[in-house]
Amino acid sequence: MKYLIVNADDFGLTKGVNKGVVECYKNGILRSTSIMCNMPYANEALQVKELCPDLGFGIHITLDAGKPLSSPEKVNTLVDERGYFKRGFPHSLDDADVDQIRIEIEEQIKKAFSLGVTITHMDSHHHAQSHSKVIDAFIEMAHKYNLPVRSTPLDKEKIIKAGLKTVDNFIYTFYDDGVKKENLLSILGSLEEGTTEIMSHPAYVDDELVNISSYHAKREVERKILTDKDVLQFIRDNNILLTNYSILK
């Protein structure tokens, strides 16, 4: 059987992102999203869950955007003079203290569990989990909170060796120049048996998103493709089961 998890990263970043998640669930193939717990609209998770009962919510561990949930004094090697995370991953973490990374990851996990929705998995913004200073704390916290995780080509071997549950295949090519309907249909046509995650970033683009994310215009295109009638029909015709990370728990 082919089990497909289409996950929307960046839930909570803006209202337009959250609105895009709802749209792609109700009228498209999205069944999973991951929450940026340090962002202003993360608290909309329960409200969205009521609109989208089968939507899975993961944690999008964020270490290079916005402010930490920990007090700046506790994670001073992660922040700039204004108290924001240092920008420019991966080099932004070059001088980071691994214990401080662990502290902040756990704060974000605790925030996620306080939002009133069942947490299905954990992944990370800009694949920060693959950084040599992050991966061990990421694995430790996933074990502690019994969470399946996304695995990328850079960290899959270590994640599997650690005994964490993860998908069989992770597809990250539906992004930027790869945001085309024919590309998504090609990806769907090449799905292997087992579990596959396709990473996505759908949204309604508003001024807030334009001001904080360089990746914004393509989010509108993603939203339209993920709700395209040809894509929906392909899923039906090929017996692909849409699901979320709860299938791994």
Curated annotation (Swiss-Prot):
<dbReference type="InterPro" id="IPR011330">
    <property type="entry name" value="Glyco_hydro/deAcase_b/a-brl"/>
</dbReference>
<feature type="binding site">
    <location>
        <position position="60"/>
    </location>
    <ligand>
        <name>Mg(2+)</name>
    </ligand>
</feature>
<keyword id="KW-0119">Carbohydrate metabolism</keyword>
<dbReference type="GO" id="GO:0019213">
    <property type="term" value="F:deacetylase activity"/>
</dbReference>
<dbReference type="GO" id="GO:0046872">
    <property type="term" value="F:metal ion binding"/>
</dbReference>
<dbReference type="InterPro" id="IPR006879">
    <property type="entry name" value="YdjC-like"/>
</dbReference>
<protein>
    <recommendedName>
        <fullName>Carbohydrate deacetylase</fullName>
        <ecNumber>3.5.1.-</ecNumber>
    </recommendedName>
</protein>
<keyword id="KW-0460">Magnesium</keyword>
<dbReference type="Pfam" id="PF04794">
    <property type="entry name" value="YdjC"/>
</dbReference>
<comment type="similarity">
    <text>Belongs to the YdjC deacetylase family.</text>
</comment>
<feature type="binding site">
    <location>
        <position position="125"/>
    </location>
    <ligand>
        <name>Mg(2+)</name>
    </ligand>
</feature>
<keyword id="KW-0378">Hydrolase</keyword>
<comment type="function">
    <text>Probably catalyzes the deacetylation of acetylated carbohydrates an important step in the degradation of oligosaccharides.</text>
</comment>
<dbReference type="GO" id="GO:0000272">
    <property type="term" value="P:polysaccharide catabolic process"/>
</dbReference>
<dbReference type="GO" id="GO:0016811">
    <property type="term" value="F:hydrolase activity, acting on carbon-nitrogen (but not peptide) bonds, in linear amides"/>
</dbReference>
<keyword id="KW-0479">Metal-binding</keyword>
<dbReference type="InterPro" id="IPR022948">
    <property type="entry name" value="COD_ChbG_bac"/>
</dbReference>
<comment type="subunit">
    <text>Homodimer.</text>
</comment>
